[in-house]
Amino acid sequence: ILVEPKPNEPIDRSICGTAGHALAVGAYTVDPSRVGLCIESAHSILAGLDPANDMGFALALNKLWGVHLNDQNGCRYDQDKAFGVDNLRNAFNQVKVLYENNFGDRGNFECVGLDVKAMRTQPDEDCYRHLINSKRIFELLLDKVKHFDYEFQAACVKEQNFEKLEMYVMELLMGIK
């Protein structure tokens, strides 16, 4: 059973509104080993959480079996924006946590999906633009993650100079590094 937590919509209440809630409910099933999570970026943001943290939490428990990557502007309705268009740093963190944990390489149910939205007002020829854009942003961020300087990160952590590390990440994302 793959649970995709969502804190609101369609009825503004949920028993499994967050990854933690879903895993707690899953722990009380007849066979908890058969319950995992599909973290959707926008749903974590709707709950006021960080999608990368939700993914890391589920990965630590071997319960992240799928992700739906998209973006969200605040705690409103589920906007299903293209991945990374609202918060590029947040998107980078998600790609980084998935890459660092070899998500998708374990041969089980792990899969990365791009959440789909129906834009009823756009022309037919652009109906897949949301997915094309999400995939492109994911690929660009994956390249940034692959060039991330982990030795520099370790030095910053050792020095407790997190502002220096933050600036490194921002310069990396802006193409300066």
What positions do the PLM features span?
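Glycine/proline-rich, flexible active-site/cofactor-binding loop segments
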Residues: 1-9
